């Protein structure tokens, strides 16, 4: 169910684009994201910072698309979001010595510091690459191809990267029986 809620705006954007075109799809994406945030807030009481960021970026770039009647802005939206996420990971690591990937996942999984660093750099690179790839598709192909890439290519690459990360992590995660309980370790 969470996955459906996460992909709700992009699925509606895709469907609206196929029926009515980019401008109606953009308005639908803005409305769907507002509904998504409202649902999350009602259901869970808390909206994650990344979700607020996503709402802000879609309202800003989607609104600019509708006001200027130019699809350029909505095509930049994924890149801006990817680069903001990657930039946050980069700045956190370099300037504040804070690994945000570890902060998000550290309670669920115990990993050595170098593995956390590699994960952080991996996600930073992934987001940077996805931002560039989005722009390349946006400026080298027609809008229909870009929308298809946004849904199928972007999500597909994200899933592939998550699977690659899971395989990488599986080499470093200890089975619970392999180590003494944490309260018994020196």
Curated annotation (Swiss-Prot):
Pfam families: IspA. Keywords: Cell inner membrane, Cell membrane, Membrane, Transmembrane, Transmembrane helix. It is found in: Cell inner membrane. InterPro entries: YciB. Its main location: membrane. It is a multi-pass membrane protein. The chain crosses the membrane at residues 10-30, 47-67, 76-96, 121-141, 149-169. GO terms for cellular component: plasma membrane. Plays a role in cell envelope biogenesis, maintenance of cell envelope integrity and membrane homeostasis. Belongs to the YciB family. This is Inner membrane-spanning protein YciB. It comes from Acidovorax ebreus (strain TPSY) (Diaphorobacter sp. (strain TPSY)). The gene is yciB.
